[in-house]
């Protein structure tokens, strides 16, 4: 069986206009996949040079396959049908290592056609590293490497204002573009680079903050033989991902034209502020996960897919989203409903086995950041507690007993909560405290909740009633009236 290469698999090759820091699965099934579609359907005509930003020889370089690899996108489409779509990606030209090919790395700045910089160097990548120097070949941190590359471009083109870059980080931190820009400016000042360079950074370059959303499941280890048989070639860089994707970029409106988004519709939004989109994702996608997990798991289910195929649990989650979360969010209702519909479709994806216990990690913090704001906003707006979000809190407290149908399961959270719950549930079993007292102790933890939740009218009583119902009847019976 042949391995992918451009001689045996000839096709389009595009001029290099994009630098990408990061060779991982996510960017290859997200950014490079989108660039490939735009290259095929528009005159974007842009090839990617992947820069491996860390010193590692594993996985091997994409250049061993001349930059070619296959994405397999699978999940439920807009009609709810299971689809699997294989695509040979031709947008990547080559990969270079910043450690073993430093001169080649700097030469990227000399190419007048270069226009975009994408990156995903993990959440820790956009950070300051104290020892980084201008003459390091290379510096350790990604922002320092980028500063050096930008200075190379500034010098080579004598500060020409039409030679700046559009820099689009995809790292999962808030306002990643702003954070990256601040670090680049910090290195420029620390290295005493000329004032003209600092002005050029601001005038000629755009640092765009982003929100990225796609579950990328990566190399399909267990299915490789079968998939390669179907494809008819060997591909060491096979990459799998879900059908859904969303790319929100906070940047100049002209970006839509530059990326040719006006000529081919991708799920990419160019916006003035990513904040409402971030809030939407946290409240609907992450919030639904967090409400679902303790309810579904204690109802005897193990994966998100099983939960969504269970009529009652699915109804509980959908009613929580549409009746309790969406009404208190600050974006047009139709936009929120269309996003919510995509979310529930993603939860049903038959190709992804998402274990409830793995999502349960750090459940107390997740409840505070993802559900509590909507619970409190609903109470404030209507004068009554949202029934399902309140029930989810009771289910969460019950979850920390660590026992289902007589069998124990691992609960992962910080030591404070694990010890606290062990003590509280032990006292409850010994009848030292009642359910209402247990709930009041949990809700009074100001250090965690950032407020005293026992002061929210009716919350302790409602959570205690729900918790008693769960303990007496079991989760199935207790949740039924809310389905």
Swiss-Prot record:
Binding positions for NAD(+) per the UniProt entry: 18-29
PANTHER family assigned: ALTRONATE OXIDOREDUCTASE-RELATED, MANNITOL-1-PHOSPHATE 5-DEHYDROGENASE
Pfam families with a match to the protein in the record: Mannitol_dh, Mannitol_dh_C
Protein name: Altronate oxidoreductase
Gene giving rise to this polypeptide: uxaB
Induction: By galacturonate, tagaturonate and fructuronate. Its expression is subjected to catabolite repression by glucose.
Origin species: Escherichia coli (strain K12)
EC code(s) of this entry: 1.1.1.58
Catalysed conversion reaction: D-altronate + NAD(+) = keto-D-tagaturonate + NADH + H(+)
